[in-house]
Structure formats: C-alpha cells, structure tokens
Amino acid sequence: MCGVRVAIVAESFLPQVNGVSNSVVKVLEHLRRTGHEALVIAPDTPPGEDRAERLHDGVRVHRVPSRMFPKVTTLPLGVPTFRMLRALRGFDPDVVHLASPALLGYGGLHAARRLGVPTVAVYQTDVPGFASSYGIPMTARAAWAWFRHLHRLADRTLAPSTATMESLIAQGIPRVHRWARGVDVQRFAPSARNEVLRRRWSPDGKPIVGFVGRLAPEKHVDRLTGLAASGAVRLVIVGDGIDRARLQSAMPTAVFTGARYGKELAEAYASMDVFVHSGEHETFCQVVQEALASGLPVIAPDAGGPRDLITPHRTGLLLPVGEFEHRLPDAVAHLVHERQRYALAARRSVLGRSWPVVCDELLGHYEAVRGRRTTQAA
C-alpha cells in the first residue's frame, strides 16, 4: 500500500497512559516505519494542569479542550471544536481512524463525513459496562444508544475480541470486524524477572499474585480482598487511581506499588508467579496479554476480551463472574502448583501477536474502507 495520510482522532492520548493511548502510540510507530503520514487529534490536559505535547515523535498533535465527567469516566473527555475540522481539512487525510470514539470521536466522525473521508471506528472502551460499575444503569442504556448511532455512521467498526464483536452486533451495529492488539514480546518476557524485587515484595517467600491496572470501580479490584486476607500468598497491586486509598484500607497486607511503566512494568510482571485480572468489562484486556508474554499463568472472569486470550487449563483459568471471589483461592493454588507448565504455554501463546503483525492488519482495514468509498463513487 502506497503512502497513506491517516488522521487519528483519539478519545485518549498521552500524557494519559491507558489501553487507548498505548495502542495509538503503537499505530503511530508502525505508520512512520512503513512510510505513512499521520496527524493526531486528542484532548488537552484539563484546566489547571500543564499543557500536553503538541508534537509526538515527529507527528503533529492537534489538541482540543477537555472536561472531566466523573460519573462516566475517570479520564478527561475531549470537546470537539470547529478548529478540529480546519485541522483535518488542512491535513487532507485519506482515512480517519477513530480511536475509542465517544464525544471527541463523534465530532471527528462528522468532520470526516463532511470532508468525504472514510472512517474506521475502533471500539476499545466498554463505557456502558463502566457506567453499570459506577451504579448508573440509565447511563449504560444511554451509552448504548449513543454508540449505536455513532458506529452506524462509520464505514467500518473494529472490535478487539470475539465477545465484543458479538456484543456490538447484538446492539445492531453493522460492518463490525475484528482487530486485536499486539504485544511487545521483547519487553514483556520471563527474562525480566527480578529476584531482588521478589524478595522485597515477599520476604517470607510466599507465592506472589499480581494485578496490574487502573484502580477504579470498573476494575473490581475489591474482588481480591479475600485472597489478600487468606495469608497464603502475597498480593501485589500495580497501578493507581481513585480507588487506591479505599483498596489499601481494605487490603492492608497487599503491596501497592503505584503505576509502573516501561522496564519497571516489565520487571513487575515477570517477578510475579500468577496474574489475576478482576474486572469483566474488558473489550480486549491488554494487561492479560502482557502477563502471558511475561510467562505468567492468568486468572480472569469468564467474560469479554480475556476469553480470546486465555486457554483454560493451558495458559490460565476463566472463572464465572458470579463465583469469581469464591473460586479464586483454589484457582490460585492450582496455578502456583502447576506454574511451570502453564508458564511455558502462556509465553508461547502470544509469540505471534507482535505489534507489526497486528498493525499490518489495520492497514488492510484502512485500504478496505478507501476501496469501498472509491467503488461507491464510481
């Protein structure tokens, strides 16, 4: 495919670090490496914070104002502006990539339609599920109505997992295709294991069970409280968020490291014995894939993205959502006992999922919507 001009309208981007921003960074790296041009449109930091970068690795980042909506998400949401349309028109894209579109993505979608540019909408965040976790089911219903309207206007919707595809199709969203996520198998690897770190976390030698992620209601980290209280393992929680103080109070024996990135994050994964993910509202669940790459057997709820990533009784265990807490201690004990067998299979299961391979698939989706528009125009 010859050089393509791709405008990425990202609902979240650096300095926010999450699944959406991380995947956008990987896509940008691949576009640059393969000779394509990019523009990013993303939220600025909220009022009162330092301005976010306007240039990322040579790629222009057009920032829009952001606002906080704490009853819907802990992340700032970008507000579409007319300047965004001007930025798109000036860049003259061949395709507009909508990364986890919500409010800003909706503005980007309409701007693209006004300019006659095809769109690929990447569904990455289970906002309806998050709303339910925050105890506001009416918002969940409204969110589905919003996403149905938005994605029906896109030329193609990409879902990261089979479960998410099925959910979107059940909601009446058309033209849904699967596009998974890659993983850096060089960075996330068993070789990153750090024995000094392990001794600091568990000086008495107890098996180390870890969680990595944002400490927010939708992650249901409180489901690990019983495991922490059992005393059979050392629970290590890597991440930060609005629930941290409450969780630390509920799990005084757990180790809370705060957020970790890069080499420190890779060492944290590899220094665990078993990985547990506690939330069921995951469209993909990149942390599970990173844990598998690190050679960890994984336990997760039998819902959403982890179903595509975990092979039960081979790379980990999927537990019924309603029985997760009850079954968790026995599941952990089993994986600790059989760790070596599971660890080898876990690592092997992700070796073919590198970011270059996955991003080449994305380029194919770009080409498909461009071809569809060309055919319609003819």
From Swiss-Prot:
Alphabetized Pfam families for the sequence: Glyco_transf_4, Glycos_transf_1
GO MF annotations in UniProt: hexosyltransferase activity; mannosyltransferase activity
InterPro entries in alphabetical order: Glyco_trans_1, Glyco_trans_4-like_N, Glycosyltransferase_grp1
Listed name of the protein: GDP-mannose-dependent alpha-mannosyltransferase
GO biological process, one term: phospholipid biosynthetic process
Family to which the UniProt record says this protein belongs: Belongs to the glycosyltransferase group 1 family. Glycosyltransferase 4 subfamily.
Further remarks about this protein from its record: Was identified as a high-confidence drug target.
Alphabetical keyword list: Glycosyltransferase, Lipid biosynthesis, Lipid metabolism, Phospholipid biosynthesis, Phospholipid metabolism, Transferase, Virulence
EC code: 2.4.1.-
Biological pathway: Phospholipid metabolism; phosphatidylinositol metabolism
Coiled-coil portions: none
Gene: mgtA
Function: Catalyzes the addition of a mannose residue from GDP-D-mannose to GlcAGroAc2 to generate 1,2-di-O-C16/C18:1-(alpha-D-mannopyranosyl)-(1-4)-(alpha-D-glucopyranosyluronic acid)-(1-3)-glycerol(ManGlcAGroAc2).
